[in-house]
Amino acid sequence: ETVKFFSVIQNKLHFAATGMTAAELIQARADHQLPNMGLTSWKKTEVRKTDVAVAKNYLKEKEISELNRIVVMWLDFAEDQARRRKQIFMKDWEGKLDEFLRVNERDVLPNAGQISRQAAEDHARAEYDRFSAGRREFKELSAEKDYVKELEKTAKQLPENPKREQKKHDKK
C-alpha cells in the first residue's frame, strides 16, 4: 500500500509539472534515435539500461525547475501540518495534494494515466537495446578508424623503399 501511495503521489507531481505521468514521460521520450536516447541526465558516464526507466531522467530543465518548486511547496505544507500535529492518514494525503495543486493553479491528475508503468518500462528497454546496439557499432567503427590512422602513421615512418635500403646494407 505504501509503494502504491508514493507512486500515486509521484505521478500527481509529475503531471502537475509536465502534464504527463511518469510512465507517459518515459513512453513519450525514450527514443533510440535521439542523442543519449532522449535522456537529459543519467548516473554514470554513459546511458545505461537502469537509467531509461526513470522518468525524471527525461525532464527538461524547465520541467525540473517546476517539479522542484512544487515539491518544495508541498513538503513545506506537509511539514507545517506535522508541526501543528494535524493527524493526516496516507489515504487523506492524496486528496490534500489535489487540493494543494488546485489552490496553486496546477494541473491535477484525474486518473491513473494512459500508460502503465510496465508498458513504459518495456518500451524504454526495447528502445535502449536498439540504442545500445547503435552505440556499440559506432564505437567499433571509431576504433577501426583510429587503428587505420595508426597504421598510416607507422607506414609513413618506414623507409620509402625498403629494397633499396637493403641493397645499400648488403654492399657494405
Regions found by a protein language model. Name each.
Residues 1-172:
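Positively charged, phosphate-engaging catalytic surfaces used for nucleic-acid and nucleotide handling
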